[in-house]
């Protein structure tokens, strides 16, 4: 009888161990699947702008940019005039580094053409109405090789005539049309592209072609 009881206890222990092992494997598999779902989340796709989506908004080619309007960077206060002392600029106006996935995708993408623009004689900048802290955090996380400019409260955006008028309430008030402006060292606008659809922005190839057309 005692021998039978020992065998029964051993059998129960083995069954419990197998069950616990199965639970552990199931939990591990669930964690692995969850990780794969998070890691495989697709990035927002930004489509290239077409001729029909380009709009005539903001300052025109040949106009003077608002040189004295204040901007903020992670290093402190500056102006467009001071920035242009470093050479001609290509400025990408974007809605928000914080909540606009199309903007985030574009800002990461143009990192690839920093050197191409420098070879053509232009410094690249991104501009949004976000605070310098938010821009700096995004820039460091994405290892951006160009400077972000903070335009609070959208004075430069307004100076360029780029405020998107459809937003009159909520966090999007003050955002610009998704735009690219090329400015010479004297502050004259020498090329531009303004999109009427924030989901569509100039591709890197289109940006370089815009510069090459000058």
Q: Predicted segment positions?
A:
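Structural micro-motif
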Residues: 145-146, 164-167, 173-181
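Bacterial N-terminal signal peptides that target proteins for export
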Residues: 2-10
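Bacterial signal peptide processing site
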Residues: 23-26
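Structural microenvironment flanking redox-active thiols in thiol-disulfide oxidoreductases
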Residues: 101-156
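Thiol-/selenol-based redox modules, centered on thioredoxin-like
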Residues: 173-214
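N-terminal "domain-start" segment that seeds a small globular fold
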Residues: 45-82
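Short active-site neighborhood of thiol/selenol oxidoreductases, capturing the structured segment around
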Residues: 80-104
